[in-house]
C-alpha cells in the first residue's frame, strides 16, 4: 500500500511542520505494509535541519523543485508527483484554501482517479466560503477534523461521504518538565527576575492570533497591580519582512500610555523574542521557554486546535485562552481561564476561511490573567494530574484506517509508536 501525505515540510518551525512530523513518525511504523511518501512544502532554505524526516519516509522538497518558483507550495509539481508515486491514498493537510488549490492542481476526480483523497482540514473560523466547501465535498473521499467540535461544525455545511476526528498531541521526546535549577538558569539568561510571574504568548504574529489583545490585557493587569512583578514574554515573528502583523512594541507603549502608566517603568516588563528568519528557535529552546514561563496566554479570535497551549501545559503551566470553542477539547476550568466572548465581527467578503470571528475585550483578558495568578497553585496541581494523550493514542484509529484502506484482508493489526 502506498500512502502520500501532502503537508508542510518537517524541516520548518511551524505547528503544521510539528504535526506533519508526528503523523509521519506514526505511519512509518506501518512499514513494510505501507510505503510512505511526503510531498513537503514551504521548507525554508535558511532553516535547515530543524527536524529530520522519520526513517523510511520518502520525502520531496516541493519548494526547492518548484518550476517556475511560486509560493513554495509546489502546486505546479503536485500532479506529476502524484502520477510518479502512484499512491493508493493521498492525504492533504492544511487550511481550506490551500487544500482547494492542491485539489485543483492534482486534477483529482472522486470515483475516477486511481487513488482515494483524504483531507486533514484545519478550520479556524465558522462560515468557510462556499466554493471551498464545494470543492472539498465534491472531490474528497474522507475528511479528518481536529476535534469533535470542528467535526460537528463541518457537518453543518452539508452532506459529506465520511467525516472523522484526528486530534493533535504532545511529543514527549521534545517537550518535558525541567527541574527548578535548570528553569532558574533559563530565567537568568532571559533577565527575568526570580520572583516574577511570567506570562508567555508563543503564537505567530498574524491578525488572527490577536497579540494586541494580549498586550492590552497585560497593560491593564499592570495598571491594577503596578508594583507586582508581572512580566510578559512574547515569542513570535516581529519583523514586517517576515509577515509580522502587529508592531508589538508600539502597541504595548500605546496601551501603557492609555492606562496612565509610566512607560519607562513598565515597558521593560515586556520581553520580545524575535523568531523571524534567519533566527531559529529549536524545539529544545522552545521547551526551555515553556518551562521558564508560569502561565500561557492565547488571545486568538480563531483556533484550529491550540498546539502551543497543549505543549506549554505539558511542561506544567496553566493557560489563559479565549473561549473560541476548540480549547474545550483538551482544556477545562481546572487548568485554564477562559476569556468570554462579547460579540462578533464579520470579515470582508473576500475572506475564504470564515464569515465571522468572536470579539473579546482587553479588560476580560486582564481579568483572565489576574484570575490565573490568584489560582496559580491550584491550577498547577490540576495540571500535574492531567492525563495527556500521546500521538500513538490519537493516531491509532487513523493508522487502522490506512491499513484497512490498503489491505484486502478483513483484519489488520497496528503497532503504534509512543
Predicted regions and their residues:
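N-terminal subdomain of nucleotide-sugar transferases
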Residues: 1-47, 85, 392, 396, ...
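Conserved donor-binding/catalytic core segment of Leloir-type glycosyltransferases
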Residues: 5, 193-209, 215-218, 232-234
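Carbohydrate-associated surface elements
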Residues: 42, 149, 169
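A short helix/loop element that forms part of the nucleotide-sugar donor recognition site in Leloir-type
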Residues: 176-192
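Nucleotide-activated donor-binding/catalytic signature segment of Leloir-type glycosyltransferases, i.e.
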Residues: 245-288
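Aromatic "clamp/platform" in nucleotide-sugar-dependent glycosyltransferases that forms part
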Residues: 301
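A charged, aromatic-enriched C-terminal amphipathic alpha-helix characteristic of glycosyltransferases
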Residues: 359-364, 374-404
Amino acid at each position: 500500500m502506498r500512502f502520500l501525505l501532502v503537508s508542510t515540510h518537517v524541516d520548518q518551525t511551524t505547528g503544521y511542520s510539528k504535526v506533519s512530523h508526528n503523523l509521519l513518525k506514526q505511519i512509518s511504523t506501518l512499514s513494510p505494509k505501507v510505503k510512505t511518501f511526503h510531498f513537503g512544502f514551504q521548507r525554508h532554505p535558511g532553516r535547515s535541519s530543524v527536524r529530520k524526516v522519520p526513517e523510511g519516509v520518502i520525502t520531496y522538497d516541493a519548494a526547492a523543485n518548484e518550476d517556475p518558483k511560486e509560493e513554495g507550495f509546489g502546486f505546479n509539481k503536485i500532479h506529476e508527483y502524484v502520477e510518479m508515486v502512484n499512491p493508493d491514498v493521498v492525504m492533504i493537510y492544511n487550511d481550506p484554501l490551500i487544500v482547494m488549490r492542491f485539489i485543483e492542481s492534482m486534477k483529482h476526480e472522486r470515483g475516477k482517479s486511481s487513488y482515494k483523497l483524504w483531507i486533514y482540514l484545519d478550520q479556524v473560523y465558522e462560515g468557510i466560503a462556499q466554493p471551498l466547501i464545494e470543492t472539498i465535498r465534491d472531490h474528497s473521499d474522507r475528511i479528518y477534523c481536529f476535534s469533535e467540535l470542528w467535526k460537528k461544525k463541518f457537518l453543518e455545511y452539508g452532506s459529506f461521504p465520511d467525516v472523522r476526528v484526528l486530534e493533535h498531541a504532545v511529543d514527549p521526546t521534545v517537550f518535558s518538565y525541567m527541574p527548578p535549577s535548570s528553569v532558574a538558569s533559563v530565567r537568568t539568561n532571559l533577565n527575568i527576575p526570580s520572583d516574577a510571574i511570567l506570562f508567555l504568548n508563543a503564537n505567530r504574529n498574524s491578525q488572527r492570533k490577536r497579540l494586541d489583545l494580549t498586550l492590552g490585557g497585560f497593560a491593564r493587569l499592570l495598571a491594577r497591580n503596578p508594583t507586582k512583578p508581572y512580566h510578559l514574554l512574547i515569542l513570535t515573528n516581529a519583523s514586517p519582512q517576515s509577515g509580522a502583523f502587529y508592531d508589538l512594541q508600539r502597541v504595548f507603549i500605546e496601551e501603557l500610555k492609555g492606562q496612565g502608566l509610566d512607560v519607562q517603568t513598565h515597558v521593560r516588563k515586556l520581553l520580545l523574542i524575535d523568531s523571524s528568519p534567519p533566527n531559529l528557535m529549536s524545539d529544545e529552546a522552545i521547551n526551555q521557554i515553556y518551562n521558564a514561563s508560569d502561565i500561557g496566554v492565547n488571545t486568538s479570535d480563531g483556533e484550529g486546535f491550540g498546539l502551543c497551549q497543549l505543549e506549554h501545559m505539558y511542561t506544567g503551566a496553566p493557560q489563559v485562552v479565549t473561549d473560541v470553542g476548540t480549547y474545550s477539547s483538551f482544556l477545562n476550568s481546572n487548568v485554564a481561564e477562559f476569556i468570554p466572548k462579547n460579540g462578533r465581527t464579520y470579515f470582508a467578503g473576500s475572506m475564504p476561511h470564515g464569515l465571522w470571528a468572536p470579539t473579546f475585550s482587553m479588560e476580560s483578558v486582564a481579568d483572565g490573567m489576574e484570575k490565573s495568578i490568584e489560582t496559580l497553585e491550584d491550577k498547577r496541581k490540576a495540571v500535574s494530574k492531567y492525563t495527556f494523550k500521546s500521538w500513538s493514542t490519537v493516531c491509532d484509529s487513523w493508522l487502522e484506517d490506512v491499513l484497512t484502506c490498503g489491505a484486502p484482508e478483513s483484519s489488520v493489526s497496528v503497532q503504534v509508536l509512543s
